[in-house]
Design a protein with these regions (language model features):
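Conserved structural position within tetratricopeptide repeats
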Residues: 61-64, 98
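Canonical tetratricopeptide repeat
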Residues: 41, 75, 109-110
Length: 121
């Protein structure tokens, strides 16, 4: 029995199980580019369902449609963090902060602030 528990723990650890991030992805602000908004909304649906690679696909498409959106960079950061790619998460969180336009969801994010502080923001 102990062997099965150990095998299960190793398998879950190797599969990159999601972290319980306390902050959800952000919706785009009113007036956002329509295709960016629809792609971002799809990304949020996938993210909330735990399908982080699918979420990344849609968040990247939203970012392509509007690269000036701090929210899409924030969402990319969350999804990359869930996938275990801390380097890309940090890159996107830095960009999100630069493009935040006063959005408290980005500027006051404990995830962003803690991660960037640890990695010299």
């Amino acid at each position: 029995m102990k062997a099965w528990v150990l095998i299960l723990m190793i398998a879950l650890g190797a599969s990159g199980c999601s972290k319980d991030l306390k902050e959800p992805p952000l919706t785009l602000l009113p007036g956002a580019e329509p295709s960016a908004k629809s792609r971002n909304d799809l990304g949020i649906e996938h993210y909330q369902a735990g399908r982080y690679l699918d979420a990344l696909l849609h968040f990247n498409q939203a970012n392509f449609a509007d690269p000036t959106s701090g929210e899409t960079h924030f969402n990319l950061g969350l999804a990359y963090l869930q996938e275990g790619n801390k380097e890309k998460a940090i890159k996107n969180f830095r960009k999100a902060r630069k493009l935040a336009r006063g959005n408290p969801g980005i500027l006051e994010s404990s995830i962003v602030n803690e991660l960037l502080q640890k990695n010299q923001g």
